[in-house]
Swiss-Prot record:
Gene Ontology molecular function terms on file: heme binding; iron ion binding; monooxygenase activity; oxidoreductase activity, acting on paired donors, with incorporation or reduction of molecular oxygen
Listed name of the protein: Demethylepipodophyllotoxin synthase
Signal peptide annotation: none
Residues the record lists as binding heme: C458
Pathway: Aromatic compound metabolism; phenylpropanoid biosynthesis
InterPro entries hit by this protein: Cyt_P450 (IPR001128), Cyt_P450_CS (IPR017972), Cyt_P450_E_grp-I (IPR002401), Cyt_P450_sf (IPR036396), Plant_Cytochrome_P450_Monoox (IPR050651)
Annotated Gene3D superfamilies: Cytochrome P450 (1.10.630.10)
Membrane topology: Single-pass membrane protein
GO biological process, one term: phenylpropanoid biosynthetic process
Gene: CYP82D61
Tissue-specificity statement: Rhizome-specific expression.
Length: 519
């Protein structure tokens, strides 16, 4: 009976509040104001949410809306309006002329819980704290000087992982050994990110010692849970009055995961503090957590310094590992499905590097086809097909339309980068298009913005553009690659914050360079 009474009360409250909801959220706009078009099919209360849950991926559904409604339109996501941009010129307008209006991220359950109450840089509101933290990360982790000092980390990880792959082939004593390259790349990129940030390695023969075995097994699982949860759909982000129900159990799982992460990062932080007290490290040997300890000694950032350190390190690991892994997995998948492109890449490596030594960073400037492969991969499979959402802070005008404060901005990079008005045969894999077309990926050429643009663009663009070609070149140079039975690679995608391949990437692998390169 108590449950029935509670239900009656909820229903009464619902019908009392429903007219208010329609008045404030669905009221007709001023006829003098030109507003963006809106796709048909919105329902009361939930808006267009049901259309985004029809089985296809959100960026593809929004692309189909653009085909019918034009390159810019608005949709209703529960209590929130969103402006969806599907055109490079309009994206340019958002990220240049009007960038000052799009500097905030939307609030949400994941941002609050897993972002340590919005302390993490990627979800922090725009203001003095965000500006100061971004400056610290850019200077102390992503500056040319710091990247130069960190190069040995990714060189070492690529070398170690390649040697382990060679040993696997050697141990099996067969022409080709079968490897899930998706998992291999996930292990490599997570090792790389964690090593740069906290000096740890978790996979392979050179990983943690026996006393760290539990930590070594728990860390990857917990971090990948966080990757998944940060990109999960939480209904209460769009219908806040349902949060108390925790439909789907996301909030409970987020709290459990962030608690596990906090224990992990606190242990690392305490370890770094102990080493610091016992004499510390030379500047060139310091990882990012060491650097942050020094900087935060005299911090005036307005938050608990340990929380700032943990969230800064977590943000870099999250931002680096999964996006790099996903891009490299797509790059290999596309090459395996296009053997002529794979042969061209390996011929280029043989010409400029040979088969008696490993690829060096100094070789990359000559490897123009490898560079074109990276660009074409990021064009077809951007790490985040929908760029990180933003919130309009003031009323503004975009593409001639009035956009109200509080509206969310969704930029469909996937659609922009397949625009037939910009790209010939936009859905075809053609790395050659970038041999004659001078386009960079740093956010200034708006037809190719896989890392975003404006002040909220991914700060680690420079790091990604060094690690991606070097890693891919090492793999293609070091190993012959083919699919079992010459089958096509399954290119099914997963939903989520990172645009990842849904299925394993099973590849037959054999060395193609001198064995001395793996010693």
């Amino acid at each position: 009976m108590d449950s029935l009474h509670c239900l009656e009360t909820l229903l009464l409250g619902f019908f009392v509040l429903l007219p208010c909801f329609f008045y404030f959220v669905w009221k007709k706009p001023n006829n003098k104001i030109k507003e963006p078009p809106q796709p048909a099919g919105a329902w009361p209360i939930i808006g267009h949410l049901h259309l985004l849950a029809r089985g296809d991926l959100p960026h593809k559904i929004l692309s189909s809306f653009a085909d019918k409604n034009g390159p810019v339109f608005k949709i209703q996501l529960g209590v929130h309006q969103a402006l969806v941009v599907n055109n490079s010129e309009i994206a340019k307008e958002c990220f240049t002329t009007n960038d000052r209006f799009f500097l905030n991220r939307p609030s949400g359950v994941a941002a609050k819980i897993m972002g340590y109450n919005y302390v993490m840089l990627g979800v922090a509101p725009y203001g003095p704290y965000w500006r100061d933290m971004r400056k610290i990360i850019m200077l102390e982790f992503l500056s040319n000087r710091r990247l130069q000092s960190l190069k040995h980390v990714w060189h070492s990880e690529i070398s170690i992982s390649s040697k382990e792959l060679y040993k696997l082939w050697e141990t099996q004593n067969i022409d080709f050994c079968l490897v899930d390259m998706k998992q291999w790349l996930a292990d490599l990129t997570l090792n790389m990110s964690v090593k740069m940030v906290v000096g740890k390695r978790f996979f392979g023969s050179a990983s943690a010692s026996a006393c760290e075995e539990t930590e070594s097994s728990n860390c990857p699982k917990t971090l990948r849970n966080m990757f998944r949860l940060m990109g999960s759909f939480v209904l209460s982000d769009y219908l806040p009055y349902l949060r108390w129900l925790d439909l789907g159990g996301h909030e409970k799982e987020m709290k459990r995961t962030v608690k596990e992460l906090d224990i992990l990062f606190k242990g690392w932080l305490d370890e770094h503090k102990r080493k610091r007290l016992s004499g510390g490290k030379e500047d060139d040997d310091q990882d990012f957590m060491d650097v942050m300890l020094s900087i935060l000694e005299e911090s005036k950032l307005g938050n608990d310094v340990d929380t700032i350190n943990k969230t800064a390190c977590l943000a870099i690991i999250l931002g680096g590992a999964d996006t790099t892994w996903a891009t490299l997995t797509w790059a290999l998948s596309l090459l395996l499905n296009n053997p002529n492109a794979l042969k061209k890449a390996q011929d280029e490596l043989d010409l400029h590097v040979g088969r008696d030594r490993n690829v060096d960073e100094s070789d990359l400037v000559k490897l123009t086809y490898i560079d074109a492969i990276i660009k074409e991969t990021l064009r077809l499979y951007p790490p985040g097909p929908l760029l990180g959402p933003r919130v309009v802070t003031e009323d503004c005008t975009i593409a001639g339309y009035h956009v109200r404060a509080g509206t969310r901005l969704i930029v469909n990079a996937w659609k922009i980068q397949r625009d037939p008005l910009v790209w010939s045969q936009p859905h075809e894999y053609q790395p050659e298009r970038f041999l004659e077309r001078d386009v960079d990926m740093k956010g200034q050429h708006f037809e190719l913005i896989p890392f975003g643009s404006g002040r909220r663009a991914c700060p680690a663009i420079s790091l990604a553009l060094q690690v991606l070609p070097l890693t891919l070149a090492h793999i293609l140079h070091g190993f012959e690659l083919r699919t079992p039975n010459q089958n096509k690679v399954d290119m099914t995608e997963t939903p989520g914050i990172v645009h990842a391949k849904a299925t394993p990437l099973e590849v037959l692998v054999a060395p193609r360079i001198s064995p001395k390169c793996f010693v």
